[in-house]
Amino acid sequence: MTIAIRSVEKQFGRYPALNKVDLEIADGELLALLGPSGSGKTTLLRTIAGLEFPDAGQVLFDGQDVTYASAAARRVGFVFQQYALFKHMTVAKNIAFGLDVRKGKDKPSKAEIARRVEELLKLVELEGLGGRYPSQLSGGQRQRVALSRALAVQPSVLLLDEPFGALDATVRKSLRRELRRVHDATGVTTIFVTHDQEEALELADRVAILNNGRIEQIGTPDQVHDAPETAFVCGFVGEANRFDGQVSGGRFKAGALTVPASALKDGAATAYVRPHDFALDEAGFEVLIERAQVQGALTAVTALTSDGRRLEISASRADADRFTGAVKIVARKAHVYAA
C-alpha cells in the first residue's frame, strides 16, 4: 500500500498542528515519524489512520482519496503505547478480536481464526501463551500481543504510536528488533511515531523529522544524521556541539573554532560539530580535559575551551590516555547554517 500526504493542514483552535505537510510513503516501507513533543507527529499519524480529518489537503491510499474515509474503511492496524488489551480476554481472544467481530461473509470460520491466531503467536514468538491473560504477561509480551492483534485483520497499513514508550530500555531494544523482523516477514506498509532518536535510526527505512507541524527533512537514517538539511535537524538528531558565531569570507568563526563555510554569505551563523568529528591535532585549538570516561569501545570526553565553552568529544578507547590535561583538537567536519 502506497500512501501520499498532499498539503495537509490541521489546526486545533489557534494552534497549527500540521502545516502544509507533503509526504510520499512507498509500498512495504517502514517509516518513522520523529520529533519533539508538539511537533505534529501523532496528529499526522492519526490523520493517516482516519482518527483525525484534515482541514485542508488530501490523504491517498494507492492513489485513491481516503481523506474523509473512516479508519475501518481504510483497513489500518493501530498499536498504542498502552497496549489497549482486553483484560478479561485470553491472549488468543485478544488477537482474534478483530476477526471475531466481523459480520457475514467477511467473518472467517472458527478454524480459520484459530489458524491465524496460531500463525501470529508463532510470528511474535509467543507460542503456547494463547491461554494466558494480559495480567499474566510481561510488558514486552503484552506489546507483542497488541502487535499481533493489529496484524490479525491483515491491515493494508500498520500504524504504531510510541509503541515502546512504556517499556524499560532492555525490553525496548529487544522489541525494536522484533518489530523489524515482523515487518520484513509481512511486508505491510508501516509507520510509527517516536521521540526516541535511537529507535527511529535503528528501525526505519526512512525517517521524517517533524517540527512545529512541518516536515524539516525526510531521508534514510544515515542521511538525516550525516547530512542534516536544517539547523533544527542537526541539533535534534544525534549529539552535537553548538557554536554561535559569524561567517566572513567563506569561513565560520566562534571563539577558537574556525571551519569552512563557503556556501554561506557573511553574517551570523550557527555551527554544529558531532562529538566524533573532533580529533587530536597539534595544529588545532587548545582545550582542557575535564573528564575522560571509557564506555565500551569508545571514550567519552568532556573538555573546556579557553572561553569557557564545554565540549563533548567521542574518541576511540585506544586514545583514552591521550585525553588528559591540556590538549589541542580540530573539528574535521562541521555543519554550518545561517542564523
From Swiss-Prot:
Which residue spans traverse the membrane?
none
**CC annotations in GO:** ATP-binding cassette (ABC) transporter complex
Its placement in the membrane is given as: Peripheral membrane protein
Cysteines joined through disulfide linkages: none
Keyword ATP-binding part of the UniProt annotation: yes
Where along the chain is ATP bound? G35, P36, S37, G38, S39, G40, K41, T42
Q: Which InterPro entries match?
A: AAA+_ATPase (IPR003593), ABC_SmlMolc_Importer (IPR050093), ABC_transporter-like_ATP-bd (IPR003439), ABC_transporter-like_CS (IPR017871), CysA_C (IPR041193), Mo/tungstate-bd_C_term_dom (IPR008995), P-loop_NTPase (IPR027417), Sulph_transpt1 (IPR005666)
- Which transformation does this protein catalyse, written as a reaction? sulfate(out) + ATP + H2O = sulfate(in) + ADP + phosphate + H(+); thiosulfate(out) + ATP + H2O = thiosulfate(in) + ADP + phosphate + H(+)
Which is an annotated GO molecular function term of this record? ATP hydrolysis activity
> Can you give the residue ranges of the ABC transporter domain?
3-237
Q: What is its EC number?
A: 7.3.2.3
Entry keywords, A to Z:
ATP-binding, Cell inner membrane, Cell membrane, Membrane, Nucleotide-binding, Sulfate transport, Translocase, Transport
Q: Which PROSITE patterns does this chain map to? A: ABC_TRANSPORTER_1 (PS00211), ABC_TRANSPORTER_2 (PS50893), CYSA (PS51237)
> Could you confirm whether the keyword Transferase appears in this record?
no
Under the heading SUPFAM superfamilies, the entry gives: MOP-like, P-loop containing nucleoside triphosphate hydrolases
Q: Where in the cell is it found?
A: Cell inner membrane
Question: What is the purpose of this protein?
Answer: Part of the ABC transporter complex CysAWTP involved in sulfate/thiosulfate import. Responsible for energy coupling to the transport system.
Q: Which PANTHER family match?
A: SPERMIDINE/PUTRESCINE IMPORT ATP-BINDING PROTEIN POTA, SPERMIDINE_PUTRESCINE IMPORT ATP-BINDING PROTEIN POTA
**Similarity remark:** Belongs to the ABC transporter superfamily. Sulfate/tungstate importer (TC 3.A.1.6) family.
Subunit and interaction comment = The complex is composed of two ATP-binding proteins (CysA), two transmembrane proteins (CysT and CysW) and a solute-binding protein (CysP).
- NCBIfam families reported for this sequence: 3a0106s01
**Protein name, entry field:** Sulfate/thiosulfate import ATP-binding protein CysA
Please tell me the species this chain comes from.
Caulobacter vibrioides (strain ATCC 19089 / CIP 103742 / CB 15) (Caulobacter crescentus)
What gene, per UniProt, encodes this protein? cysA
